[in-house]
From Swiss-Prot:
This is Small ribosomal subunit protein uS8. InterPro entries: Ribosomal_uS8, Ribosomal_uS8_CS, Ribosomal_uS8_sf. The lineage of its organism: Bacteria, Pseudomonadati, Pseudomonadota, Gammaproteobacteria, Pasteurellales. Transmembrane segments: none annotated. It comes from Pasteurella multocida (strain Pm70). It comes from the Bacteria.
Amino acid sequence: MSMQDPIADMLTRIRNGQAANKVAISMPSSKLKVAIANVLAEEGYIESVKVLDGVKPELEITLKYFQGKPVVESIQRVSRPGLRIYKRKDELPKVMGGLGVAVVSTSKGVMTDRAARQAGLGGEIICYVA
């Protein structure tokens, strides 16, 4: 049986990996997962992103900790296969009053809510990270 929501699976692997104090986690790779991971790395929530080529490409994410505690306090899926959530540029949410980020899939690629607001773009809210 195939996976119903691979993005939710990715976010859960990150959450579980940090709860278990893992150094790195791996999962099946896709373009969207790599784009989301790159946004999280740019924002400083994860250490690094690597795509391991093979018959089935694997995405390896190195997790980040600060003073022994996970940098990601919460990571929450918003738009899901059964209920897609789209917002216009002026409706984009501020996560934790601007302390967290919303990862948004726009027509110009995957970016943070801040970058989407600056570019004047709306899109699908993939997840909230704080």
